Amino acid sequence: MQQRSTVPQVPQYSVGKILLVWAAAAGPMAVLGWIVGPALAGPLGGLPMARLWGITVGLIWQFVLVLILLRREGGTLRWADVRERLWLRAPVNAAGRTDRRLWWWLAPLIIVSAVYALMISGVVEDLWVKLFPFFAEPASFSMNAFMASPESRAALAGNWGLFLLFLVQMFFNTVIGEELLFRGILLPRMAGAFGRWDWLANGILFGFYHWHQPWGMLGSAIDGSLLYALPSRLFKSAWFGIIVHSGQSVYFTFLLLGLMLGLAN
């Protein structure tokens, strides 16, 4: 179904302002992940859990940053206004018309994203840390190793407060924090500086924002460019990046639910 649609004009950022917004997101995440998290490892149940708390705070800050930037643009925070300024709208075709059939592109994008995450991202990460070994994940940081230990699995069973923390972290990661900042705020405002390559610049910035987990920078730049930014740019809808990125949240939610129910012991 096609409808006439006027894609609203949003202010365009200079390269300097884009980098300032990027730094406002990347800087706190790096500090929380590498300094605050380790400092609180004892009282928060170990380094992986302390980093989880710290990164969650950083992602919540990114949502606050989105609101600050919207307010500074001078518009209202009413949904009817915000949804247009953040591209939280139905997809738009090349003729500038709302075309709900374009939602079907989500199916192959989600499949490709899953294949990339399960079969390719590990290879990309290995290549990246071979090229830059100082970016390798410290063993004490590994959430996978933490979750794999029998002691941790036993402690997680029935720990619904921790399950809620994971849900909050994932929601702010792939919906209203990280993803909304990069695909809702930055991407619509980068064409003035980067032209038709705005989606690529957005994905590269997304990858190199991950100073809190630099072992994943290259992989995040690849999926951030091709799977999140490019479809969001083509269809003028940040929902594409949000939904595709949230596939990993759904996957991890089911894994965690199994741990909470003690099914993995």
Per-region residue spans from a language model:
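Membrane-interface interhelical loops and short interface/amphipathic helices
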Residues: 123-153
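Transmembrane helix-loop-helix hairpins at the membrane interface
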Residues: 112-116, 145-265
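Juxtamembrane inter-helical linkers in multi-pass membrane proteins
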Residues: 83-91, 136-144, 197
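Short helix-terminus and kink motifs of transmembrane alpha helices
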Residues: 34-38, 121-126, 179, 183-184, ...
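Hydrophobic alpha-helical transmembrane segments
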Residues: 2-9, 41-52, 140-151, 166-169, ...
